[in-house]
Amino acid sequence: MKHLTEMVRQHKAGKTNGIYAVCSAHPLVLEAAIRYASANQTPLLIEATSNQVDQFGGYTGMTPADFRGFVCQLADSLNFPQDALILGGDHLGPNRWQNLPAAQAMANADDLIKSYVAAGFKKIHLDCSMSCQDDPIPLTDDIVAERAARLAKVAEETCREHFGEADLEYVIGTEVPVPGGAHETLSELAVTTPDAARATLEAHRHAFEKQGLNAIWPRIIALVVQPGVEFDHTNVIDYQPAKASALSQMVENYETLIFEAHSTDYQTPQSLRQLVIDHFAILKVGPALTFALREALFSLAAIEEELVPAKACSGLRQVQEDVMLDRPEYWQSHYHGDGNARRLARGYSYSDRVRYYWPDSQIDDAFAHLVRNLADSPIPLPLISQYLPLQYVKVRSGELQPTPRELIINHIQDILAQYHTACEGQ
């Protein structure tokens, strides 16, 4: 099941191929991704982050075993073969416990790694770049690498214990700024320098040797770097190949390594393709998929208001706004400005903090109410044309059923299609 190692081998042989990683726990996003991969007969890489899923439940309330069960059950229900499903863990390390002393945070990180590997996650991103309570800021490359090597050893031992062999594939390094989109308004972004990338690699190689892990180096398939792509609330910093050319050329000297690019959300299709050509061959996407989900839901809510008497409407938009105001912890430190600016950001920001609220029971009830209201009778074509024009074209051509669920799924798949095309290769 070495889909990733094989992808890297083909890329190194000149195929200019890649793979995208779906970073979301939302059932509709995952259904869209599984159905899209099934239709195109490709493997599917789904990743959970250390914030979403951990041994204590993360913000989704799921452990790694829970998440795997949830994804596999969904895949089975859609007849997607589990051997084409790759599960990854993203930013695994002391990320969740930076407020604790390093010894305690790393003990938790050991258990985090054990829980992911024991649950059958095969792509493991080791990220120990963050300073803990009693650490200097920033950490040296050597400390980061030593901690990553410690976690790699835990991962290897856990994998052998549970599966009889160590077949994990690793990603090392981190991007700047923090995961999940920038907090501040951006205008310019520093690209990782070749020297910094080399220093990260050599520090990790040395640390792995000290742990007796030389043999796993060929399974370290990717280094996370910053190719110069990012987004904030209303802007996207587009990939500029010229600025990343030295970095791109540097990785050509490493036989089994490519780059992994985070925060590729909202890049143009041309930029996504160029990133893969330039060896940033693992493209992470998350907020752009839940952003598309949100677009489709807001569009359907607008259609509902045209069709259904006000007192019978789901009120999805207002419920979402009320819940976000009642529980501001997921957006308050991200969205700034006056009341109107924050209101707009809650609904429309590229950073899509609303994604943390879809599982809320009130919002979920409003969503179910919306779908029921629109499923009772066919949605008039002119309203689909008005609010979901790309889906309207497919409905008219007969390739898409105009049901609420299918319209949502297809709108998300429009984003997945851009990533699929970027990763196909020659």
Swiss-Prot record:
InterPro entries membership: Aldolase_TIM, GatZ/KbaZ-like, GatZ_KbaZ_carbometab, TagBP_ald_KbaZ
Taxonomic superkingdom: Bacteria
GO BP: any one term: D-tagatose 6-phosphate catabolic process
Pathway noted in the entry: Carbohydrate metabolism; D-tagatose 6-phosphate degradation; D-glyceraldehyde 3-phosphate and glycerone phosphate from D-tagatose 6-phosphate: step 2/2
TM annotation in the entry: none
One Pfam family named in its UniProt record: GatZ_KbaZ-like
GO cellular component: plasma membrane
Summary of subunit composition and partner proteins: Forms a complex with KbaY.
NCBIfam families per the UniProt record, alphabetical: agaZ_gatZ, PRK15458.1
Protein task: Component of the tagatose-1,6-bisphosphate aldolase KbaYZ that is required for full activity and stability of the Y subunit. Could have a chaperone-like function for the proper and stable folding of KbaY. When expressed alone, KbaZ does not show any aldolase activity.
UniProt xrefs under HAMAP family: Tagatose_aldol_KbaZ
Family named by the database record: Belongs to the GatZ/KbaZ family. KbaZ subfamily.
PANTHER family in alphabetical order: D-TAGATOSE-1,6-BISPHOSPHATE ALDOLASE SUBUNIT KBAZ, N-ACETYLGALACTOSAMINE PERMEASE II COMPONENT-RELATED
Protein name: D-tagatose-1,6-bisphosphate aldolase subunit KbaZ
Gene name of the record: kbaZ
